Amino acid sequence: MADSERLSAPGCWLACTSFSRTKKGILLFAEIILCLVILICFSASTTSAYSSLSVIEMICAAVLLVFYTCDLHSKISFINWPWTDFFRSLIATILYLITSIVVLVEGRGSSRVVAGILGLLATLLFGYDAYITFPLKQQRHTAAPTDPTDGP
């Protein structure tokens, strides 16, 4: 390995890990972990019919985490990433809420009840993600100058 490659490796590592320290990075990582735990709970139950939601949301969150971590979202400009992330988290919020209510009403088996309760927690987590990534909320307008610009 050349000296220039060795010197650029820490910078590359720093660039790749800097997103994981942000609020959005921690939130995406928490979504992946929570989806994995819900998937395990649904798989441990007698019927794993609801596990597909956890798999799909875990994959979507992991893809977005990789795109944001590697800064690929700035290189692929034909996708509107804030709206994509907002709709992903909004749809996940709605689907986890419906699935959790159905699972808790059925209430067969302790692992399904735990998965339903964790699904409600995932509803809150994805809802918070949708709230902080709402694109229109992030647009800031500069205040109009009130002082004349041509002197006193």
From Swiss-Prot:
Q: What gene, per UniProt, encodes this protein?
A: Plp2
Asked whether the UniProt record includes Nuclease among its keywords, one would answer no
The record gives the membrane topology as: Multi-pass membrane protein
- Localized where? Membrane
- One MF annotation (Gene Ontology) recorded for this entry: chemokine binding
Q: Which PANTHER family match?
A: MARVEL-CONTAINING POTENTIAL LIPID RAFT-ASSOCIATED PROTEIN (PTHR22776), PROTEOLIPID PROTEIN 2 (PTHR22776:SF4)
What are the alphabetically sorted keywords of the record? Membrane, Transmembrane, Transmembrane helix
Q: Which organism is it from?
A: Mus musculus (Mouse)
Membrane-spanning residues where? Answer: 25-45, 48-68, 85-105, 112-132
Asked if the record carries the keyword Transmembrane, the reply is yes
Q: Which top-level group of life is the source organism from?
A: Eukaryota
> Mind telling me what this protein is named?
Proteolipid protein 2
Entry function? May play a role in cell differentiation in the intestinal epithelium.
**Where mainly found?**
membrane
Q: The MARVEL domain covers which part of the protein? A: 19-138
* Pfam families, per database record: MARVEL (PF01284)
Q: One GO cellular component from the entry?
A: plasma membrane
